[in-house]
Amino acid sequence: MAKFTVLNHPLIQHKLTIIRNKNTGTKVFREVANEIAELMVYEITRDLAMEDVEVETPMGPAIEKQLSGKKLAVVPILRAGLGMVDGVLELIPAAKVGHIGMYRDEKTLQPHEYFVKLPTDIDQRQLFIVDPMLATGGSAIMAIDALKKRGATSMRLVVLVAAPEGVKAVQEAHPDVDIYAAGLDDGLNEEGYIYPGLGDAGDRLFGTK
């Protein structure tokens, strides 16, 4: 079964409170969402593989550490996932960026894929799939399906807020994909939105309704 982890770092929790607040405007919401994403990926990458390498310092040779595992990529689920990309790239500027476009039918709550654009070497990269909300889990499951179909084998799902229903659904569909969240909420309301949540993340990120 996939691991589910809530990252309880004080800075992450403080910033999550800011974006939950309905009075937080678009500019601050966007900035803080990226800050949370950066902090989350910092925590999540603690287990990246390392190797010894010899470097020449101004004073002489030294044996130091460098990354040795798979190259990294971030894959936002459009459109709201775009609001976490800059935070990840701030920490890992060499990461490539793929995109998966999804929209949710407001009546059936089912996701529909409309766009996929990925690095050509996706099978050689560790992917961070980013989306602010994990509600029913439908979009995340479909995104992971699409990535696996195209050769991806190493993925982690990174969300700001999750509902238990979505966590359970993703774990059952993809037990090999670990899930990381800044917050775990009570559940879904009758419309399928996370409660108490933070509202519509896409609208709050981009100033739309």
Curated annotation (Swiss-Prot):
Entry-linked Gene3D superfamilies: 3.40.50.2020
Pfam family, one: UPRTase
UniProt-listed GO biological process terms: UMP salvage; uracil salvage
Binding-site residues, 5-phospho-alpha-D-ribose 1-diphosphate: R79, R104, D131, P132, M133, L134, A135, T136, G137, G138, S139, D200
EC number(s) recorded for this UniProt protein: 2.4.2.9
Activity control: Allosterically activated by GTP.
Listed pathway(s): Pyrimidine metabolism; UMP biosynthesis via salvage pathway; UMP from uracil: step 1/1
Top EC class of this enzyme: transferase
Cofactor field: Mg(2+)
Keyword GTP-binding: yes
Keywords: Allosteric enzyme, Glycosyltransferase, GTP-binding, Magnesium, Nucleotide-binding, Transferase
MF-aspect GO terms: GTP binding; magnesium ion binding; uracil phosphoribosyltransferase activity
Residues that coordinate or bind uracil: I194, G199, D200, A201
Catalytic activity: UMP + diphosphate = 5-phospho-alpha-D-ribose 1-diphosphate + uracil
Entry's cofactor comment: Binds 1 Mg(2+) ion per subunit. The magnesium is bound as Mg-PRPP.
InterPro entries to which the protein is assigned, alphabetical: PRibTrfase_dom, PRTase-like, Upp_B, UPRTase/APRTase, Ura_phspho_trans
Chain's role: Catalyzes the conversion of uracil and 5-phospho-alpha-D-ribose 1-diphosphate (PRPP) to UMP and diphosphate.
Protein family membership: Belongs to the UPRTase family.
Protein name: Uracil phosphoribosyltransferase
Source lineage: Bacteria, Bacillati, Bacillota, Bacilli, Lactobacillales
